[in-house]
Amino acid sequence: MPLYSSQPLKIYNSLSGEKENFKPIHEGNVGMYVCGPTVYSNVHLGNVRTFMSFDVIFRYFLHLDYKVRYVRNITDVGHIVDDVDEGEDKIAKKARLEQLEPMEVVQRYTVDFHDILKAFNFLPPSIEPTATGHIIEQIEIIKKIIDTGIGYEANGSVYFDVVKYNETNNYGVLSGRNIEDMLANTRDLDGQSDKRNPQDFALWKKAEPEHIMRWPSPWSDGFPGWHLECTAMSTKYLGNHFDIHGGGMDLKFPHHECEIAQNEACTGQSPVNYWMHTNMLTLNGKKMAKSTGNNILPGEILSGDNTILSKAFSASVTRFFMLQAHYRSILDFSDDAITAAEKGYKRLMEALEALPAIKAGSSSSVDFAAWKQACYDAMNDDFNTPILIAQLFEAVRYINLLKEGKETISAEDLKSFSTAINAFVFDVLGLSDEKAADGNNDKLEGVVNMLIGMRNQARADKNFALSDQIRDQLIALGIQLKDGKEGTSFSI
């Protein structure tokens, strides 16, 4: 019997503003889409928090034995500066400023994004589509929206008429905004725009002559609107109606509101059952901003190369710190806060290291089954990681009492307890045992150095066939050798 059948889950739905029982469209299967990064700069810590929250959600669904299709996109075209329809594409602007091809910018920051997520022990999504890889699908959606009369072409661009859409639907259903108020608070276009209404948004933009990123379409050589990209990619891989759509709270309006409108205009149905949004990350009580210097990149935390923190902190400590707050709560990052988290993380890991030495008794003096269910209850309550972590520290207390002989545990309970705590720490929260990792790295270094010594001896004996064989097999394992004046070094 799958674990999910005995662990009912509640999710806070931004659409209803309430916690709701989670019931997937197809039993045992979860379709989840999360808006990924626009790859024009280094991923910032707030982004990492959002993606980490959904990484834990993905992990927990897998732990509950669901089959999950997790789609997280890469936006590599169409995201206009200031998130409006007029102006310059963010990637094109970066390319112009740095005198690069747009796809060089995309490649550089996509690699950075993946490197950071790997460092923080993220599971890869099931599918990671790019906007530029789905231009045809986006054009087809635009055609359908035009056919409904809600989309209209103007001078080579295509816009979504929110007023016409709102006649039969509710533009503002997710954000709680009222279209009349939005229109009243928007300046008159005064003939300076091709839009019928100030709140109309672009489905397709005609490219100016100097615009590099462009594709042919029935309306012009141009590029798709930002909101359309996620509609095309989510529905292609998850269908017109799927379980979960997530992202940062800043995407609720206009991005996610526009996605709902596009889907309903195109298919006649609401696309998503559960909308989930993560809250922001502040730094020393203030909003992060590059312009004010109140900013820190993930890599700067790991290296210690910053003016904010007293020292470097590991990826696992940073991850542990972030998960101590619920994903819907504002989290303030500071030197004091992450230093305290480091102490807690070390306490947890020390307890786990001591667990294998615990001796089983004939019976248990603690209800370990109740503790285990309390861990599930925390995660089943809208993925409440801080409550789960509190339960893990309760387990640390149990382990210390067991070490001191002040509590007892049966062999059956010890096995169940050990399996559960390791699953919640490593599989669900995605933490890493850094001491074990460091030990493995030391062992690897020792083995490679031994092979380098064997290779050096083979070269001295003029046994070049063996020397080349050792080098080639190390390369096949991803280990590069570099011969220099001071000897041979290696990199992975």
UniProtKB/Swiss-Prot annotation:
SUPFAM superfamilies: Anticodon-binding domain of a subclass of class I aminoacyl-tRNA synthetases, Nucleotidylyl transferase. ATP binds at K290. It catalyses: tRNA(Cys) + L-cysteine + ATP = L-cysteinyl-tRNA(Cys) + AMP + diphosphate. Its main location: cytoplasm. Keywords: Aminoacyl-tRNA synthetase, ATP-binding, Cytoplasm, Ligase, Metal-binding, Nucleotide-binding, Protein biosynthesis, Zinc. Coiled coil: none annotated. This is Cysteine--tRNA ligase.
